[in-house]
Amino acid sequence: MKGPRAGDDTVATREVTILNELGLHARPAAEFARRARAFRADVWIVKEGQRFSAASLIEILRANLDRGARAVLEARGRDAEAALERLARLLQELKD
């Protein structure tokens, strides 16, 4: 790892289910990516064995997170636990 997230190898994971009626489409995905970039941690979405950067709108859209989709949020870095707590909560609260 490099950049501001380096120096702490704390790893956290959390299972999530997408509840938003329209899934994680462009608008909520952009908000999710913006918030993921705010942490001192690298955050990924793992779905069906594939890893997608949670900091990238394009990667989130590639994950095809429709309503009811299950995935794992994975974070590594100083803010790993806080990142997953807040991002999982965001997924619960997202409305179109």
Which residues make up each language-model segment?
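C-terminal structural segments of small proteins and small subunits
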Residues: 62-96
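Long, contiguous binding/interaction regions
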Residues: 2-6, 30, 55, 85-86
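Compact, glycine-rich, soluble single-domain proteins
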Residues: 17-67
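Generic structural detector for well-ordered beta-strands
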Residues: 15-17, 74
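SAM-dependent methyltransferases
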Residues: 1-15
